[in-house]
Amino acid sequence: MLDTPSNRPALPAEIARRRTFAIISHPDAGKTTLTEKFLLFGGAIQMAGQVRAKGEARRTRSDFMAMEKDRGISVSASAMSFDFMNKGTNFRFNLVDTPGHSDFSEDTYRTLTAVDAAVMVIDGAKGVESQTQKLFEVCRMRDLPILTFCNKMDRESRDVFEIIDEIQENLAIDVTPASWPIGVGRDFIGCYDILRDRLELMDRADRNKVSESIAIEGLDDPKLAEHVPAALLEKLREDLEMVRELMPPLDAALMAEGSL
């Protein structure tokens, strides 16, 4: 059957539902592993791989070259697509996993000319690193909207406020948290979704499962105490009070122009 205008999906609608974004980071911040999680929760794969998987353990799909598998690094940019339903719209996400090592940064620079936005991954223990800063500047030149993902919070990490201060100082950009970790290291149990007032709890037994999501009525909701230990809950409330007092609210227009 010929692909004619009459049987082809409406072009404007197809364009409107598509989003293309790149993931950028310093080497070993967890960029490719995050890519796997996007694919998993987007329904594109059944089990997330690990960059440093040993033996016959499942490895990542985006690192497909022999060198990438052997060394646990991304050498070239790889593009993957998955659908995700949100508020009645079936969005098509085109995800581009980029090389983190400076030796292969030319491929990353070219990739960033073709995306709508970027997800910047930061190691919670190391903060803003050199290659992250270089890639951020490339995004800034294109006025790309940037979402920052602070990774490895289930390991010993720096204080979140310290990381935010470093982002604002080193990258000269305002920061508005959209979610907040509950505990760090061994005490990490999940995140509080600030924008939607939800608890996103981590499944410690199987991290390939979507975590439990619980709707709550603000930080005074009694349901919080049912799921969050008292010490962590007190710390969460103190942290979010500071966030709301000291940091700007989310401004979609500023974010879209790459200023937030």
Language model features with spans:
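P-loop NTPase catalytic nucleotide-binding module
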Residues: 2-29, 124-260
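P-loop NTPase switch module centered on the Walker A-proximal segment
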Residues: 2-122, 128, 177, 231-235
